[in-house]
């Protein structure tokens, strides 16, 4: 059944009725009844232009389409639309002024566990709470929505644009998200796909936690504090994404295993005004790999950033080849006690600062590329040593390393550096 609520736009009682309806909306969510819906047949309903106040539950299969000028107002409390039945589509609606209580999971559209197969398409959401929350449901699709947070609220007090919790087989595609906390947060949600979204002015663009067998494809992050934060997950496929002018990290891998990063482009990562509290040392890293093993990292481009790639905390047994490191202020940071070979099947990476030669013209450098030496390690441990970079003592240390390789510490070695930038990595 659909119980009715009256359009504020068409009411003659004016502001008094508006306040009354807004007050009632704070008390409880009602079935979407007296919204003046027009039956279009085959389970499809249209909502005419106007401003409608309340918190509503959709508890049966239907396709709700809002006509141009239709706006739902949540009165500043609770979730605006709550979906509790399979087979619901919400399309083309403008949603405003829902609650901002993150503990209560206030969202513009809350998709409950029973609402399997929900489709949230082409809506315009603007508010401080969560945009779309998918809660332990199956087969939901969030497509082509525009979601904007409230810049007047501190970033950490805003909701995420799209939040997946314990969800399976979700598709998030074609959305534009800005000024929320994270663009899309995926928690304990397997077999999801995040495709062709645009995330700007956020904490993290894409944030994975405890999620497996999922895809992140063809997304763009811009001016976030971390473009792609991939954490405590395995078997992720991350391809064709771009990170432009993000702070701290372009792609962060934290406890990631058996995953693929291919064909991604990261450029212009800079040091943030504040570091990331989770892992110290956010120096503008295009790629940061922390305690991550058995991953394939091939065919990516990391360019024009403060630091190209940083490996630490036991990040070993990763296949790193066919990538391009271009114009980074520092290409590699690696401090560990084990040698790392960054080439595979006789093919290494392209390094814009490689000074070797290719006498047989096979496209591979004849001299290995070794970006780190004992002097680099000394500078990482004691940054004040930078003041002595051009001093005779530093030059003597470098000469000793070359003359007596036995004193060279383990580090990164690319035995087959590429002389030319590689072609884009084909998609898996």
Curated annotation (Swiss-Prot):
SUPFAM superfamilies: Pectin lyase-like (SSF51126). Keywords: Periplasm, Repeat, Signal. It is found in: Periplasm. Residues 1-29 form the signal peptide. Gene3D superfamilies: Single-stranded right-handed beta-helix, Pectin lyase-like (2.160.20.10). PbH1 repeats lie at residues 85-113, 115-136, 137-166, 167-188, 189-210, 211-232, 233-255, 292-313, 315-353. Required for the assembly of the copper chromophores of nitrous oxide reductase. Could be part of the ABC transporter complex NosDFY. The complex may be composed of an ATP-binding protein (NosF), a transmembrane protein (NosY) and a solute-binding protein (NosD). Belongs to the NosD family. This is Probable ABC transporter binding protein NosD. It comes from Pseudomonas aeruginosa (strain ATCC 15692 / DSM 22644 / CIP 104116 / JCM 14847 / LMG 12228 / 1C / PRS 101 / PAO1). The gene is nosD.
